[in-house]
Amino acid sequence: MSRTRTYLLYAALALLALLLAGALFADRLAPRGSGPHAYTLPLQADATEWDRVLAPMLAEHPRQTGAILLNDGLEAFAARALSARGAGRSLDLQYYMWHDDLTGRLLALEAWRAAQRGVRVRMLLDDMNAHGLDQQMLALDAHPNIEIRLYNPFRNRSGVRRVLETLVRALRVNHRMHNKAWIVDGRAAVVGGRNIGEEYFDAASDTNFRDLDVLLMGPAVADASQVFDRYWNSEAVVPIGELGKQDAAQLQAMVRHIEAGTGRAEAQTYLRRVEATPGVQAFVTQQLHPFWVSDIRVVSDPPLKWREDDRQHWLVRTLAPVVEGARSRAALISPYFVPGTDGTGMLTALARQQVQVGVVTNSLAANDVPAVHSGYARYREALLAGGVQLHELRAQGHGQAATSGLFGSSGASLHTKAFVVDGRRGFIGSFNLDPRSVALNTEMGVLFDHPGMGAALQAEYDRLAGPAFSYAVYTDGEGRLRWRDDGTTPPTVHEVEPDAGLWRRISARMLRWLPIESQL
């Protein structure tokens, strides 16, 4: 045997040993959840601004929850920032991503200012996307009123050791917390699809996401708080202070840096855009006009989803029957859409029952994860043949859409995760229609039954599916895929994936050959 082949054999055996060790000892190698249990603070009648603002509204609508759809990125930023400014008791923040960029720093500053007022701030972040942010997180965690915990964290925080830990614990670290919630005083909550970062709040200069949240006020907020507490106190969660050293001096330096940054032209320009947005004024003046909904709740996966033997507790078991129960129309929005054999069968079965079934997802050009598009493309012809309508979001808009907030940057990508059935039952949250959301990541969202709220979500679907935003996908008489652009006169028909370059199309096709669908 040649020396090269010998080295390769030893390397393969070493890698196999690492993987076997990970399978056998992953739980022992993982940092153990050891933070003291803590729970949502008790509600009070009029102790905080949110208590006082909501009291007359909730008295007028007993046992109902107020719900406002946030489909505008600037309004979504304002809802978080302004609600934090009114906090007087607690801020519970749970996110998959929190970027160290303009909007991430501005919202971190709001959390710090709340803590300075005596508000208890709990931040729960997924550790995969917190990589590289230890210095900032440890600085914030040094504040006596702020505690940061990480979901399924790495023991090794950087470098080669972190890479090796990824290999050893590959199965365990593949499970991530995809939840998104911003909960204020136990009275109001923003739940939906947005992470914290410029691209989610119409602040990015290149590509911004079309996304959707729900601002909740009233009883359903208790559901969100219970979800947060279950995760916060689970053994999958570790305080950042146990993974690094806190530095109070670094906190003051970081706050000074962020505060100085708010005076820069970039920040001032963005904040002026936020203030000029019509919907933001409703938050400023507290002239809110929510839907008042009796049948509404926040639902989620269990925090230890990878250990859950009873899959009836998985969120998909709650959501799938709602879609399967459609009688006239099912409209689904998912940026990462990989229905698999079962999902394709469910949607085409509905279509055979004369249910109008439609899906809005990203086109190849608009998708920020081409591998996911390759997973979707496997099922495109079968979906169309089964009567499912497909609409793919374009990377650039037409007409008014081209100059809207969504397309005001150089490009756009869909990030909304929602569906509405029969115009009244629906879901808005973090759950993508793909295998990763079904079985690997934890997810959460708002499930409701209300005609007004359903009509608003249906209108959002219809707008995204319309010619200003999307291509209509179909097969011609010979069964070949075509993309129709109804935004031109006459309509333009594309014979290949529109707006996607040759290399991107080739890459997406090659990715179809890889056995990675379960990871998408």
Describe each model-derived feature in a short phrase:
Residues 2-180, 184-520:
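Charged, low-complexity intrinsically disordered terminal segments
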